[in-house]
Structures are given as C-alpha cells and as structure tokens.
C-alpha cells in the first residue's frame, strides 16, 4: 500500500461521515435511469465509475477503457442502465464504485469555457443551438436577431444567471453531484478529489485491485487569476446564490464557501 494511505483513508472516513449525515435526512430510493446512465461498468474488474463532466473524465475513461469488453456497447464501456435490472442491482451491490468531485466554482467555470468559449463543434454544437439560444433569449437585454438565431457568444454573467434561475438541473455538465451520481441512493466505496487527483487515483487503483495499471500523468489546473477574472463580472449576490444552488456539493465534499472567491465577497468595491 502507498505511504499516503493513512492520510487519504482518514479524509475518506470523514467524507463518508458527511455523506451519511446528509443522506440520513433523505428517503433512500432506487437510482433513476439518468443516474444509471452516468455509471460506466468495467465488468472484468468489477469496477463502476460515475463519470462527472469536467472532473478528469478524459483521464479516467481512456484508462478504464482498456478494460471494456467487446460486447459493442460504446467506446467507453457499457453503462449500468444497459444491463438487465437484476444484474444491474447485483453489480451496484458488489462492484467497487467510485467517483471524483471538484471545487464547484472551478467546475462551473470549466463547463462554461468548454461549452461557450471553446465549443468543440463550433456554432453547430447543441450547447450553442439549444442552451445558448435559450440563455440569450431569457437573460440578455435587447438581444440581436442574429444572436437569438445562432445562440453563439453566451457571456459568463448570462450563463450564471441562467444557472441560478433555472439551469442547474437541466444538464449534467453543471448539475449537483447528487443529481449526477446519486450518492444517497448508491453506496460509493470512494469519492476522490480533482485537486489531489494523482494521489487519489493511485489510492483507487490500489483499493480496486488494479495496481498493475498506472494513472496517466496529470497536473490539475489551478487558474485562480482566471477564476477571479470571470466571477468578478457578476454581482456578489449571485455568488451567494450559487452557494445555495451548489450547497450540497460544497458541504459534503469539504469545499469551503466562498472558497477561492472569498476576496470578491469581502471586497468593498
């Protein structure tokens, strides 16, 4: 076992305690089909990974993809929802299950940039043609007909106003972790953190008995200046509103609020 196991194990225990306290107030139910669609199965190694967008999924999927079967499901391996109900339930009970989380403000900015600053499919990207049009229509004052038609050029304040008012539950790229992975309905063996990804990934591979594989080199991005640049564009009250929208993501996973935005809230300007 690795030399950091004691420290990592302690943090894991503390986090599981917070999860128990939070989920203890909720009635347990069967995971819905949307959640099961986020759980990727690597049957040979009895591992299930909940993919959370913008939390190192591009590092985990290629690694775990080495283990997919040749059953023709998808390039990333089958998802739990694709199995018969009885088998899916058994896998959820017996397989090693893990997910990763990220500081909520960082993840939200990463999602915005990925979908609206550098859209992969350009102006044909559905995040532009569907969500972009909606955001501009509802949250831009006096939008041009061109902007309404294209959905291109969503500004960060517009995106945040959309999230606060209606958008947090509309897409998993910016949904709460509870809605993506259903951690109150599924008992995860481990929840790792983007900020300590290399160490946490090694811990997961050890616990899942996959020590013959090595997690790819990774350096978590810490762009505090960029974060402050974007969030300084919105009113302080909106930052507080985001804290309420993502309250469970902050509280359960040990991220302080307002965390990296503390200087913005405390400033008098």
PLM feature spans:
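Membrane-interface amphipathic segments in extracytoplasmic regions
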Residues: 1-269
């Amino acid at each position: 076992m690795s030399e950091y196991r004691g420290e990592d194990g302690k943090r894991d225990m503390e986090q599981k305690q917070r999860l128990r306290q939070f989920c203890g107030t909720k009635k347990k139910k069967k995971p819905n089909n949307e959640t099961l669609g986020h759980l990727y199965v690597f049957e040979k190694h009895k591992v299930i990974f909940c993919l959370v967008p913008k939390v190192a999924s591009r590092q985990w999927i290629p690694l775990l993809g080495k283990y997919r079967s040749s059953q023709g499901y998808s390039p990333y391996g089958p998802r739990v929802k694709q199995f018969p109900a009885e088998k899916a339930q058994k896998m959820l009970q017996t397989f090693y299950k893990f997910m990763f989380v990220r500081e909520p403000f960082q993840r939200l900015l990463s999602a915005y940039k990925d979908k609206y600053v550098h859209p992969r499919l350009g102006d044909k990207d559905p995040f532009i043609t569907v969500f972009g049009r909606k955001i501009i229509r509802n949250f831009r004052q006096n939008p041009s007909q061109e902007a309404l038609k294209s959905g291109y050029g969503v500004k960060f304040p517009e995106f945040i106003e959309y999230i606060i008012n209606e958008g947090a539950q509309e897409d998993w790229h910016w949904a709460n972790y509870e809605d993506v992975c259903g951690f109150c309905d599924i008992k995860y063996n481990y929840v790792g953190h983007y900020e300590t990804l290399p160490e946490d990934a090694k811990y997961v591979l050890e616990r899942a008995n996959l020590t013959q594989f090595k997690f790819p080199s990774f350096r978590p991005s810490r762009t505090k200046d960029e974060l402050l640049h974007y969030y300084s564009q919105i009113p302080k009250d909106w930052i507080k509103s985001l804290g309420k929208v993502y309250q469970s993501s902050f509280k359960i996973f040990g991220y302080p609020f307002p965390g990296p935005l503390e200087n913005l809230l405390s400033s008098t300007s």
